[in-house]
Amino acid sequence: MKSPICEMFDIEFPMVAFSHCRDVVVAVSKAGGMGVLGAVGHTPEMLEQDLKWIDEHIDGMPYGVDLLVPNKFEGKGSNKTSEDLRNMIPQEYRDFRADVLKQYDVDGEILRGGSEAKNIELASDSRFGKNLRQDGAQKLLEVAFSHPIQLIANALGVPPKWMLDMGKENNVKVAALLGAKEHAIKQVQAGVDILVVSGTEGGGHCGSVSTMVLVPEVKRAIQEHGDIPILAAGGIATGEQMAGVMACLLYTSDAADE
């Protein structure tokens, strides 16, 4: 089951698992794969605490960190507060949410914005928004690079040049999420080390193209740009599905060479 990803990180299985749970990150890495901590909702202090815990429990195995780092942040929305953005939610959506909560007898006090819960929610939104700006993202990256991570992943388009530069300076591979072959070409041209090709089965975050269609499309599209490692994501939950995706990648490589 060896692949370029296995050789790159010296892992036994070509399986990279994203999780917000530090315990899962450690378990995956110690089982022969590679765990990646989703940290966009962390403060720098929270990230330091989690990464220190991982370092103490992972027995020197490789792991990574995943963030959302925009290539640029411009436009009329850049100066809006969390409350401004909340007020932009259409009333139709609010009514629909209330109906669903009532239909399934869900206690919606927090979702309806009770005073205490609303303050907590706004604080969380504020932290999330700050981490999407360069100053907030840089602070998280500085914490991440102060630990022995081997991968930093960006789940929001082409990483900005300063993020790619930080990766090179710290000898850390940079991965980026994508959902179309056009995205892949832009990522490769920017200098990304690993492409995370996510089909619509992966929550629909990147687009509407199925994983088994998207992966070979991307493989063919980047062939002329060199041998860039690909991680397939979306709808891969069993050993059979994992084997199918690996076969898809191998067949596409052979076909492109003919």
In which residue ranges do the predicted regions lie?
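Residue-level detector of alpha-helix initiation sites
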Residues: V158, I236-A237
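A generic structured-segment signal
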Residues: D227-L231, Q241
